[in-house]
Amino acid sequence: MAPALNANPTTKRDELSAPSASHKLGMSSMASRAAGGGLKLTGLPDLSDSAGTLSDIFGTPQMREIWSDQNRVACYLEIEAALAIVQADLGIIPKNAAHEIVEHCRVQEIDWALYKQKTELIGYPVLGIVQQLVANCKDGLGEYCHWGATTQDITDTATVMQIRQSLTLVKQRLDSIVSSLEHLAEQHRNVPMAARSNLKQAVPITFGFKMARFLATFRRHQQRLVELEKRVYTLEFGGAAGNLSSLGDQGIATHDALAKMLDLAPAEIAWHTEHDRFAEVGTFLGLLTGTLAKLATDIKLMSQTEVGEVGEPFISNRGSSSTMPQKNNPISCVYIHACAANVRQGAAALLDAMQSDHERGTGPWEIIWVQLPLMMNWTSAALNNADFVLRGLQVFPDAMQHNLDLSKGLIVSEAVMMGLGNTLGRQYAHDAVYECCRTAFVQDRPLLDVLLENHEIASKLDRTELEKLCDPANYLGQCSQWIDRVLSRPSSA
């Protein structure tokens, strides 16, 4: 996890704070809306102290809590309670059975040691919960639990619920990143710097333009998130093979009522072995963290000692070396890169999970259980680090100007070429300026001086015109207009 920013005198944004380790996951419960009892999801244990030393570097307490055994089982129980309620309303099971089942759908009643033993024995994580629920209900009323459902109905729907909780956190951090980029694009819209192509200086741009390009990309991720939510937040309830045969002519009615109670979209048809929804989440996380890694790469390169144009927020000892006291490593960007690389591999695994056989599969389904929690934690960590960096990013305009001047005018050679193009022809002007650039580089002289010595060029453009063309500030193109275009378009937040 990125630290709180509390010691950076250059920060212009509101003071940062890291996500609190004591944060309690807020989860809505359908049972609070149901008559006759409530499913209690409060009081989940704080899992932050049980994690390893690196856990808050490659994850966050909030995301770990979402993907914990306790929260997963809480989702199972919420689904089982909702199923009992809707089936009682439809007359499929007795109302007193539904009430009894709901009363015992509480994580506090789970024997975790027994559950672990049963899960390892059975190989699937739902039956052990159902067995305990049946046993905890009086008068045999628990026998109506899990009526017409199959294990995958519960696990897939619970996974969808956990994804919804997770993407709520993702959206919060993504929105904060977008806000920071909006601020940086506007604040630095007129700060000139060198664009780089193949790691070489290309032409002048502004730092605000560079930030606006990132802003546009992260806004596209906001759009993708909105779009995928419509497809992903969907109920899975199809019974043994998807056709709900065990519920007779009330199968689809049960499905639709259950979806409504869980605040999920009803599926158009069962999807036990059609895992495109989970794969879409994985590829979205891959795209998002890929952009975070690109951002981290640029910041790392721009913070090199020889460049020094930006720096991560300064906090004493953060990114320090055990051997070199002068070091202030871009440690947040380092971890963003590591998280993104892992998410990409996870996305590939979720695509593998799509290759499931027939109506109920033999294996690829379980890939999702392993990869999604890891991917969500890596994504959350990458987002937190990026949010921290952008909200306190140190920007050094003097260094940007210094680097613009390093080439002694070579960076505006395109401007000179275009200025000569109308009289000499573009290609001829290109070759003439190329030779002048080579001479200026070899002799370590200003390009302007070499251009003035070239009789052909000097005959077409006088000194005043060449001086204007050789000033990087005069060759910023449409940077400001592009920034205006991006900032004028509303965020998808």
Swiss-Prot record:
It catalyses: trans-aconitate + H(+) = itaconate + CO2. GO terms for cellular component: cytosol; nucleus. Its EC number is 4.1.1.113. It is found in: Cytoplasm, Cytosol; Nucleus. GO terms for molecular function: lyase activity. Keywords: Cytoplasm, Lyase, Nucleus. Pfam families: ADSL_C (PF10397), Lyase_1 (PF00206). Residues 1-22 are annotated as: Disordered. Pathway: Secondary metabolite biosynthesis. Disruption phenotype: Abolishes the production of itaconic acid. Trans-aconitate decarboxylase; part of the gene cluster that mediates the biosynthesis of itaconic acid and 2-hydroxyparaconate. Cis-aconitate is secreted by the mitochondrial tricarboxylate transporter MTT1. In the cytosol cis-aconitate is converted into trans-aconitate via isomerization by the aconitate-delta-isomerase ADI1. Decarboxylation of trans-aconitate by the trans-aconitate decarboxylase TAD1 then leads then to the production of itaconic acid. Belongs to the class-II fumarase/aspartase family. This is Trans-aconitate decarboxylase 1. It comes from Mycosarcoma maydis. The gene is TAD1.
